[in-house]
Amino acid sequence: MDLDAEPGVERVYQPVEVHFGDGTWALGRISGWWQDAAGRRWCRLRVARSGRPARWEPFDPARVVLLPAGGV
């Protein structure tokens, strides 16, 4: 899905922890937020060291945990 050209895309730099179904996890980042007409929130997610480019997917807070972006 190419949402980069869609109106309403908010560009961000948000560190995250991504949890996978097999119990493993990895660090990643969200570089954009977008909300569809039904109100579902989407994020542009890139998993670090995965070799895959960032992609848009529905935001699932049980799978993608937001980490502090700065300061303590």
Give the role of each language-model region.
Residues L3-A5, E10-G23, S31-A62:
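Basic/aromatic-rich interaction segments and small domains that mediate binding to polyanionic partners
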Residues P7, L67-V72:
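Acidic, negatively charged sequence signal
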